[in-house]
């Protein structure tokens, strides 16, 4: 079982990690996690991926402390950043969402290669779901839909 946890705030993520330690399991990914940048080193060290929006914030109290550099800061700390969306329209344009996060990082001096940002919507989500041996990369034996 690869636990996926829905939460927004850093204190909630830390509390859940403590709960996981007490009960002997590991969290695979936090979803939404708009304050993950505050605990990025902890998340990277524990190999917890973070599935988040590029720029949704402020729509409710838990989402007020989001920043557009969140994806880039998680990546810079060595964590697994993942772009996601709750929107049926946004999910069709995750490449554009990844680009927003990539540009936000570059604006504050975080050098991220385009190939690395592409992992935010390919290899990292596959890892979070535990299907990285089947898809998420272009490699012999893996499944992929490619448009050239």
What are these regions (language model features)?
Residues 5-9, 31-35, 60-67:
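A general structural motif
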Residues 1-27:
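Polyanionic/metal-chelating signatures
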Residues 10-14, 33-40, 90-92:
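Active-site environment of divalent metal-dependent phosphoester hydrolases
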């Amino acid at each position: 079982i690869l636990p996926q946890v829905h939460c927004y705030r850093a204190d909630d993520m830390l509390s859940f990690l403590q709960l996981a330690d007490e009960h002997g399991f590991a969290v695979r990914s936090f979803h939404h996690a708009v304050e993950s940048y505050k605990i990025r080193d902890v998340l990277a060290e524990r190999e917890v991926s973070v599935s988040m929006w590029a720029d949704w914030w402020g729509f409710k109290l838990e989402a007020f402390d989001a920043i557009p550099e969140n994806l880039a800061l998680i990546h810079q700390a060595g964590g697994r950043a993942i772009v996601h969306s709750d929107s049926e329209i946004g999910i069709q344009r995750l490449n554009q969402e990844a680009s927003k996060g990539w540009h936000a990082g570059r604006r504050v001096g975080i050098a991220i290669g385009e190939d690395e940002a592409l992992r935010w919507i390919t290899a990292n989500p596959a890892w979070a779901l535990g299907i990285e041996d089947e898809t998420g990369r272009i490699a012999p034996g893996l499944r992929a839909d490619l448009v050239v």
